[in-house]
């Protein structure tokens, strides 16, 4: 069975850190319908690290969680430079409080660090910032993270859940 699902604007390529109003409206409409007909937790992810839209949609639609790509890291990729949003998102969450979990990527796929920072520092920053879970991904969609990367993240997470964000399929799930 499935424990939870995430709804993304996966087809809105090329991704940007902001989207057109019509995309937000359509996303909200679709998410609302899915939430009304779902018995599992549902989350919101608006590509790419569009955290203000994610929080607004999650808040309005009673989502269970949001995925935050760059909570405590500054990264670069095809979407340009993406700046850490943790402090601003936490202020937004404080202004519009709701019990919505923050599931945050560590070294999010399709990007690389602008300035190198140790993994333990990144994870500690995400935890201290208020994340409810961490996401471990491979280098791109469909690519699994290494077992060593997952084990290291689990070790450093200090009990915070670690979720695999890419590459899980019938061939890799046993690992």
Model-identified regions with their sequence ranges:
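Alpha/beta enzyme core
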Residues: 1-19, 25-40, 49-160, 164, ...
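Short, conserved loop-to-beta-strand elements that form functional interface hotspots
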Residues: 46
């Amino acid at each position: 069975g499935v424990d939870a699902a995430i709804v993304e604007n996966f087809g809105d390529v090329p991704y940007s850190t902001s989207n057109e109003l019509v995309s937000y409206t359509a996303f909200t409409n679709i998410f609302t319908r899915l939430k009304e007909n779902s018995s599992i937790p549902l989350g919101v992810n608006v590509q790419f690290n569009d955290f203000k839209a994610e929080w607004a949609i999650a808040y309005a639609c009673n989502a269970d969680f949001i995925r935050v790509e760059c909570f405590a890291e500054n990264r670069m990729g095809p979407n340009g430079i993406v700046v850490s949003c943790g402090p601003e998102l936490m202020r937004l969450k404080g202004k519009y409080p709701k019990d919505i979990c923050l599931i945050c990527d560590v070294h999010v796929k399709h990007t690389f660090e602008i300035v190198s920072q140790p993994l333990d520092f990144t994870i500690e920053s995400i935890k201290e910032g208020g994340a409810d879970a961490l996401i471990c991904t491979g280098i791109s969609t469909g690519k699994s993270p290494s077992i060593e990367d997952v084990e290291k993240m689990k070790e450093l997470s200090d009990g915070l859940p670690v979720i695999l964000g890419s590459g899980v399929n019938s061939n890799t799930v046993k690992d």
